[in-house]
């Protein structure tokens, strides 16, 4: 970890020598790090990946990120009644400035660094380039999910085109899916010794695990499209016939997180304590949505006490209805995030949960898209979630429940299998992979019954964000027109 941390510091110094203020100058931003090499840049790129998931706006310390807004719109995260920290999100007030840093910094920080690796001209870096392709696909898919059409084919010209055209969202999805296949092929054909384990802060240079990660991302992308009517049977078949398999443990990144300023795990930076031991603003604000907390309480879910700690005022675990700013739900009367989420400032940063992989497989098997026993995969997903959060009793929780969103036999007898899978995925990833459970809610409508916040500006929950003001200012000729209802109209191709 110390070696990776040193590599990151060196790489950041190289990249920061001539950073540009032009945020979407992936075509020209961060200059051309001609003195750097993929082995130096990879750990810095992986650190940037972690930041995009949990702390994309580090300079302003806002905590804006894909996963935080996802947790809010999935009905998981709420705001303490005396903090008013997430009020615009809970009101469904979505402007061109809303969470704009997740667009801007995904391009300038994350995609730029991976693109540098992917296009590096010297020989001997095949596995680095394959990893870069996989991670570019990971982030670009999130941009498509969030915004629809995005710059892709012209987005990486290194200064030759600072106003890139927008590509059709489905065409981008198809292109990055193919890039995942190309990355797998590159790994299969890479000469031995083309990657040093100490320079890979995610999977320690285990290229078989990188192939599994790519295959699991492919499954995620295919299930996104399950309602489109597209004929994807051949792609599902290839997922199995390639013999790669799927991830069976959480994919995490840890470049050497430490309890020092600017070196903490970004999730902990946002929701935990400062290096001096003081609660952050988000720590004092972040609470469970009442609907989420009550579901766990009603089902005697052992994960409850890992996700939350008792309220300071009376020792009860209590959530808060979203957008409810009253004294009854002040911060000391509601439950902060618990030890299953906030371990310490050096904890690994989850990129993709092992439980998500199992729930993806359970859904695909239930739909008859891949072989496998959905019941077994579902129960394994619950067990993995318990393990990820440090809880025990997964088997009894599922088997003894009278709730058909928990007990598989009851779900099967009532035709509720899909909602059970998505609901358990929602619990497992609600605070960790908030973006994924938001997209699942858009795609499936599950979990059912999540209330629209009182005072929200729309009777339906958001599906998308708007193109940033900065993009409209610098690339207006190419930015697609968006209607007044664009944040709610399910305009990404797979949502329609």
Task: Explain the meaning of each model-derived region.
Residues 35-39, 80-392, 411-418:
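Structured, solvent-exposed acidic/aromatic patches
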Residues 19-76, 122, 236, 337, ...:
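Membrane-proximal, proline-rich intrinsically disordered regions
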Residues 57-66, 307-310, 393-394, 433-443:
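Short coil/turn segments at secondary-structure boundaries
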Residues 12-16, 53, 429:
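Residue-level signal for alpha-helical transmembrane segments in multi-pass membrane proteins
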Residues 1, 19-22, 137, 176, ...:
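Terminal processing/anchoring signals of secreted or surface-associated proteins
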Residues 1-28:
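Bacterial Sec-dependent N-terminal signal peptides
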Residues 386-496:
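C-terminal functional modules
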């Amino acid at each position: 970890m110390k070696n990776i941390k040193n590599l990151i510091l060196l790489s950041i110094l190289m990249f920061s020598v001539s950073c540009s203020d032009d945020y979407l100058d992936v075509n020209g931003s961060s200059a051309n790090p001609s003195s750097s090499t993929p082995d130096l840049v990879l750990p810095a790129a992986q650190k940037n990946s972690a930041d995009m998931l949990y702390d994309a706006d580090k300079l302003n310390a806002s905590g804006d990120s894909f996963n935080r807004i996802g947790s809010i719109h999935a009905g998981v995260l709420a705001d303490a009644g005396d903090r008013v920290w997430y009020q615009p999100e809970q009101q469904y007030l979505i402007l061109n400035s809303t969470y704009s840093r997740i667009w801007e910094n995904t391009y300038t920080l994350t995609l730029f660094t991976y693109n540098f690796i992917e296009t590096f001209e010297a020989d001997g870096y095949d596995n680095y380039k394959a990893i870069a392709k996989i991670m570019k696909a990971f982030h670009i898919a999130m941009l498509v999910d969030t915004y629809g059409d995005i710059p892709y084919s012209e987005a990486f010209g290194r200064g030759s085109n600072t106003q890139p055209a927008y590509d059709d969202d489905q065409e981008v999805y198809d292109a990055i899916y193919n890039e995942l296949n190309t990355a797998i092929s590159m790994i299969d054909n890479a000469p031995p010794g083309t990657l040093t384990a100490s320079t890979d802060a995610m999977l320690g240079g285990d290229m078989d695990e990188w192939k599994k990660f790519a295959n699991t991302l492919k499954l995620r992308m295919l299930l996104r499209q399950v309602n489109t009517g597209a004929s994807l049977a051949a792609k599902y078949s290839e997922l199995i016939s390639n013999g790669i398999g799927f991830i069976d443990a959480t994919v995490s990144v840890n470049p050497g997180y430490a309890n020092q300023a600017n070196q903490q795990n970004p999730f902990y930076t946002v929701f935990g304590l400062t290096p001096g031991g003081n609660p952050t603003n988000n720590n004092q604000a972040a609470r469970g949505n009442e609907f989420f907390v009550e579901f766990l309480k009603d089902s005697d879910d052992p994960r409850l006490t890992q996700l939350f700690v008792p309220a300071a005022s009376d020792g009860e675990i209590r959530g808060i209805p979203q957008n409810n700013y009253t004294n009854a739900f002040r911060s000391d009367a509601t439950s902060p995030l618990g030890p299953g989420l906030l371990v310490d400032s050096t904890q690994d940063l989850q990129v993709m949960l092992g439980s998500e992989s199992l729930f993806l497989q359970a859904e695909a098997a239930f739909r008859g898209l891949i072989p496998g026993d959905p019941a077994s995969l579902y129960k394994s997903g619950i067990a993995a979630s318990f393990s990820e959060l440090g809880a025990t009793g997964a088997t009894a929780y599922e088997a003894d429940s009278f709730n058909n969103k928990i007990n598989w036999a009851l779900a099967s007898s009532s035709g509720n299998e899909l909602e059970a899978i998505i609901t358990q995925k929602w619990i497992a990833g609600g605070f960790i992979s908030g973006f994924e459970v938001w997209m699942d809610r858009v795609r499936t409508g599950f979990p059912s019954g999540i209330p629209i916040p009182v005072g929200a500006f729309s009777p339906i929950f958001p599906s998308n964000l708007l193109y940033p003001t900065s993009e409209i200012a610098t690339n207006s000729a190419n930015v697609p027109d968006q209607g007044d209802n664009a944040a709610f109209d399910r305009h990404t191709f797979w949502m329609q």
